[in-house]
């Protein structure tokens, strides 16, 4: 008799995805981030659901309702800070996951990679809308500044902005719709994640060598389930460390002041995980140019499969490309730092140089390095 997990229509899908899945025997801890992101997404949906039970999406009571959650709801402070810091954890894991994909050439699975880019955009949109909900100063002004960027679109821009606002400024209508979208988006993300996995399981996982691993596969369970559990423990420990000891470390103090349309904060800036893109946006003096650069900074990921000119898939045996990838990583750290600084000398110049370096490295230097390595290896 066939085992139930191999015959039952529903359990069979889970079996082929997480139990009997043939997996390369040499994948490293860098392959843990996918499952960690899955757990993180589940945590965000659960904590978010409990927060939504007590939150009111109204400009007069939104700020008070968040305060009420922290003060009066049983373990409300824990749920709120798990949700806020969970977003930071999510982005740390996403950036590491993307970095792994770039280093090991996982972007050659173009369908999986492109769905991943769509996922990144969806997660960024969700995080932005979530940041508006507590209705603090930075929530309000962040929403005003970022939505206002759409007015740079020729002809339809101003109308589009007012349509998104639901009026002539960020107000009650904006908050209500942002709450509605923030609630529904994670479920769209879950659907996208399933598509992401569907396409990944069509080809099988990549591995550190970048070579075909069909001849050496092992079942996902128990080898990688136990390895993933170690990742969960590390992530859980880090999240609790953050939530219980310094929950406001990554937040903005301005968001503890209720939103006031008559008083602009001295430095309007988004959460830390958007700062690199914000720095690129600010480094271009023209509004439309800045918006285009902002979009390009994320959408450039979709070009990786085209820009891959090396005869090898992974960077494991390509030291020049490795150096450039670390230059790119350092450059992103610099952009993140600049995004949080005021718009004054010397930060403007550093931001502009870092923005140029970002695009130059990806579009020109890395493909050139690949060609050079091919030449050196006489391939």
UniProtKB/Swiss-Prot annotation:
<dbReference type="InterPro" id="IPR005798">
    <property type="entry name" value="Cyt_b/b6_C"/>
</dbReference>
<keyword id="KW-0999">Mitochondrion inner membrane</keyword>
<feature type="transmembrane region" description="Helical">
    <location>
        <begin position="226"/>
        <end position="246"/>
    </location>
</feature>
<keyword id="KW-0812">Transmembrane</keyword>
<feature type="transmembrane region" description="Helical">
    <location>
        <begin position="113"/>
        <end position="133"/>
    </location>
</feature>
<feature type="binding site" description="axial binding residue">
    <location>
        <position position="182"/>
    </location>
    <ligand>
        <name>heme b b562</name>
    </ligand>
</feature>
<dbReference type="GO" id="GO:0005743">
    <property type="term" value="C:mitochondrial inner membrane"/>
</dbReference>
<feature type="transmembrane region" description="Helical">
    <location>
        <begin position="288"/>
        <end position="308"/>
    </location>
</feature>
<feature type="transmembrane region" description="Helical">
    <location>
        <begin position="77"/>
        <end position="98"/>
    </location>
</feature>
<dbReference type="InterPro" id="IPR027387">
    <property type="entry name" value="Cytb/b6-like_sf"/>
</dbReference>
<keyword id="KW-0249">Electron transport</keyword>
<feature type="binding site" description="axial binding residue">
    <location>
        <position position="196"/>
    </location>
    <ligand>
        <name>heme b b566</name>
    </ligand>
</feature>
<dbReference type="InterPro" id="IPR005797">
    <property type="entry name" value="Cyt_b/b6_N"/>
</dbReference>
<keyword id="KW-0408">Iron</keyword>
<feature type="binding site" description="axial binding residue">
    <location>
        <position position="97"/>
    </location>
    <ligand>
        <name>heme b b566</name>
    </ligand>
</feature>
<keyword id="KW-1133">Transmembrane helix</keyword>
<protein>
    <recommendedName>
        <fullName>Cytochrome b</fullName>
    </recommendedName>
</protein>
<dbReference type="InterPro" id="IPR048260">
    <property type="entry name" value="Cytochrome_b_C_euk/bac"/>
</dbReference>
<feature type="binding site" description="axial binding residue">
    <location>
        <position position="83"/>
    </location>
    <ligand>
        <name>heme b b562</name>
    </ligand>
</feature>
<comment type="subunit">
    <text>The cytochrome bc1 complex contains 11 subunits: 3 respiratory subunits (MT-CYB, CYC1 and UQCRFS1), 2 core proteins (UQCRC1 and UQCRC2) and 6 low-molecular weight proteins (UQCRH/QCR6, UQCRB/QCR7, UQCRQ/QCR8, UQCR10/QCR9, UQCR11/QCR10 and a cleavage product of UQCRFS1). This cytochrome bc1 complex then forms a dimer.</text>
</comment>
<dbReference type="InterPro" id="IPR030689">
    <property type="entry name" value="Cytochrome_b"/>
</dbReference>
<keyword id="KW-0479">Metal-binding</keyword>
<dbReference type="GO" id="GO:0008121">
    <property type="term" value="F:ubiquinol-cytochrome-c reductase activity"/>
</dbReference>
<comment type="function">
    <text>Component of the ubiquinol-cytochrome c reductase complex (complex III or cytochrome b-c1 complex) that is part of the mitochondrial respiratory chain. The b-c1 complex mediates electron transfer from ubiquinol to cytochrome c. Contributes to the generation of a proton gradient across the mitochondrial membrane that is then used for ATP synthesis.</text>
</comment>
<keyword id="KW-0830">Ubiquinone</keyword>
<feature type="transmembrane region" description="Helical">
    <location>
        <begin position="178"/>
        <end position="198"/>
    </location>
</feature>
<dbReference type="Pfam" id="PF00033">
    <property type="entry name" value="Cytochrome_B"/>
</dbReference>
<dbReference type="InterPro" id="IPR036150">
    <property type="entry name" value="Cyt_b/b6_C_sf"/>
</dbReference>
<feature type="transmembrane region" description="Helical">
    <location>
        <begin position="320"/>
        <end position="340"/>
    </location>
</feature>
<keyword id="KW-0813">Transport</keyword>
<dbReference type="GO" id="GO:0006122">
    <property type="term" value="P:mitochondrial electron transport, ubiquinol to cytochrome c"/>
</dbReference>
<dbReference type="InterPro" id="IPR048259">
    <property type="entry name" value="Cytochrome_b_N_euk/bac"/>
</dbReference>
<keyword id="KW-0679">Respiratory chain</keyword>
<dbReference type="InterPro" id="IPR016174">
    <property type="entry name" value="Di-haem_cyt_TM"/>
</dbReference>
<dbReference type="GO" id="GO:0046872">
    <property type="term" value="F:metal ion binding"/>
</dbReference>
<keyword id="KW-0472">Membrane</keyword>
<keyword id="KW-0496">Mitochondrion</keyword>
<feature type="transmembrane region" description="Helical">
    <location>
        <begin position="347"/>
        <end position="367"/>
    </location>
</feature>
<feature type="transmembrane region" description="Helical">
    <location>
        <begin position="33"/>
        <end position="53"/>
    </location>
</feature>
<comment type="similarity">
    <text>Belongs to the cytochrome b family.</text>
</comment>
<dbReference type="Pfam" id="PF00032">
    <property type="entry name" value="Cytochrom_B_C"/>
</dbReference>
<keyword id="KW-0349">Heme</keyword>
